[in-house]
């Protein structure tokens, strides 16, 4: 009977856990839809400003000094913007992006400092004893563009002052509900992409193209950081929903297995009691 009570207690515990994971799955699903909409809505703007900067950089300039964010110099120190969630329970997402950043840091032959977004990233950078330039936590599930400006300002100020010579950004790119890819890209100096052959954006710029380019570059960096954070949040909520769904399914499967064990043990207990009764009756006869 003691064994039956233990099994019954385990079934009750697993059932309670299943209720919690189911509730977390539903919450994550609600947040995921909103996060996906915000992340996907920012892609056209990000793509267009990248395209315009590429077109501007390809135009002949009038000799005006270009923005410091375009300056390429010998790399003596690198910074990496490491974007992670504040909370766990989102499958392998945190481990994957931390591994991406950790591998990158180990491969560098020059000092690397980290600007970290999210508690999980802060814990990771501290654990590997890496220099941390700044940390930003508790941005929430719906950060505004203005909320992320201090992050990009730290990076741009350090780069333009010569404190660092190159900046990379590590974040999780949202592909679909089931797929989220860890991505590492160069952020500074800004490297204008090459336009496809024959694609010529014949805009008339007022004032001069160099002035427009210099005005757009800080905005480009700020939007790149903001968009990467939105992508990471969409990925986080998607991964958490899938992880909680899997946890709920596993809990249901475990409940089924424990119920089967409980029924077998109960049947065995009843059989033994019947045998004892029959044996006692036979002894009295």
From Swiss-Prot:
Domain of life: Bacteria
Keywords, sorted A to Z: ATP synthesis, Cell membrane, CF(1), Hydrogen ion transport, Ion transport, Membrane, Transport
CDD domains recorded: F1-ATPase_gamma
Membrane topology term: Peripheral membrane protein
Pfam family, one: ATP-synt
InterPro entries: ATP_synth_F1_ATPase_gsu, ATP_synth_F1_gsu, ATP_synth_F1_gsu_CS
Single GO MF descriptor: ATP binding
Statement: the UniProt record of this protein carries the keyword Oxidoreductase: no
Protein localization: Cell membrane
HAMAP family per UniProt: ATP_synth_gamma_bact
Quaternary structure, from the entry: F-type ATPases have 2 components, CF(1) - the catalytic core - and CF(0) - the membrane proton channel. CF(1) has five subunits: alpha(3), beta(3), gamma(1), delta(1), epsilon(1). CF(0) has three main subunits: a, b and c.
Family: Belongs to the ATPase gamma chain family.
PANTHER family: ATP SYNTHASE GAMMA CHAIN (PTHR11693), ATP SYNTHASE SUBUNIT GAMMA, MITOCHONDRIAL (PTHR11693:SF22)
Function of the molecule: Produces ATP from ADP in the presence of a proton gradient across the membrane. The gamma chain is believed to be important in regulating ATPase activity and the flow of protons through the CF(0) complex.
Protein name as annotated: ATP synthase gamma chain
Organism: Dehalococcoides mccartyi (strain CBDB1)
């Amino acid at each position: 009977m003691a064994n039956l009570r233990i099994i019954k207690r385990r079934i009750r515990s697993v059932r309670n856990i299943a209720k919690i994971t189911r509730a977390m799955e539903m919450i994550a699903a609600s947040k995921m839809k909103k996060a996906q909409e915000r992340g996907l809505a920012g892609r056209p703007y990000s793509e267009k400003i990248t395209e315009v900067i590429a077109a501007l950089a390809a135009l002949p300039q009038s000799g005006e000094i270009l923005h410091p964010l375009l300056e390429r110099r010998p790399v003596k120190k690198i910074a990496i913007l490491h974007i992670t969630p504040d909370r766990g329970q989102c499958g392998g997402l945190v481990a994957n992006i931390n591994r991406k950043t950790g591998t990158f840091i180990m491969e560098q032959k020059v000092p690397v400092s980290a600007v970290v977004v999210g508690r999980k990233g802060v814990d990771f950078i501290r654990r590997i004893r890496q220099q941390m330039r700044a940390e930003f936590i508790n941005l929430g599930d719906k950060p505004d563009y203005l909320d992320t400006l201090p992050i990009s300002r730290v990076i741009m100020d350090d780069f333009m002052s010569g404190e660092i010579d190159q900046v990379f950004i590590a974040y999780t790119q949202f592909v679909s509900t089931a797929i989220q890819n860890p991505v590492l890209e160069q952020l500074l100096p800004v490297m204008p992409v090459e336009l496809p052959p024959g694609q010529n954006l014949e805009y008339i710029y007022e004032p001069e193209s160099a002035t427009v380019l210099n005005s757009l570059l800080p905005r480009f960096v700020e939007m790149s950081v903001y968009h990467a954070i939105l992508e990471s949040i969409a990925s986080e909520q998607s991964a958490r929903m899938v992880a909680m769904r899997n946890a709920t399914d596993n809990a249901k499967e475990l409940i089924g297995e424990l119920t089967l064990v409980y029924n077998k043990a109960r049947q065995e207990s009843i059989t033994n009691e019947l045998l004892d009764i029959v044996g006692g009756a036979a002894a009295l006869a």
